[in-house]
């Protein structure tokens, strides 16, 4: 993903610099920038307050986070219900992240939009999709046919609701 960002920025003639590592662990090595961008990682951050604060501390003008409105694997919730009769959590959400940003004193704006390419970006063979879902669902290989049938019912090719959370510094 970072390589794709680098390529796109270079192609557009945008000055950019990437830093690999966990945020805010690498913050001390990262210079302040006009715009700080964070793409599809917020749901995996254990300590969100220091994460957001470090983003803000490194931006001169703006902080931009792009993320889905709900957890990236929430599309599997119906499968958890089907196979385990479990109702998966519906939180956290992007709205809650925006509330946290505002509670920190940032004037967070949440722009919601549809990602029309969701479900079409990576064309995995069905057996790989089944394997991934089976492992995520903690099922044994002998359930592959059931998993495949469930996936065929919901190929998840509909647009996904995502957002851009941003604030000026």
Mark where each language-model region is.
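Short alpha-helix
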Residues: 88-111
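Conserved class I S-adenosyl-L-methionine
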Residues: 61-96
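Local beta-strand N-terminus motif with an aromatic residue
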Residues: 15, 32-33, 60
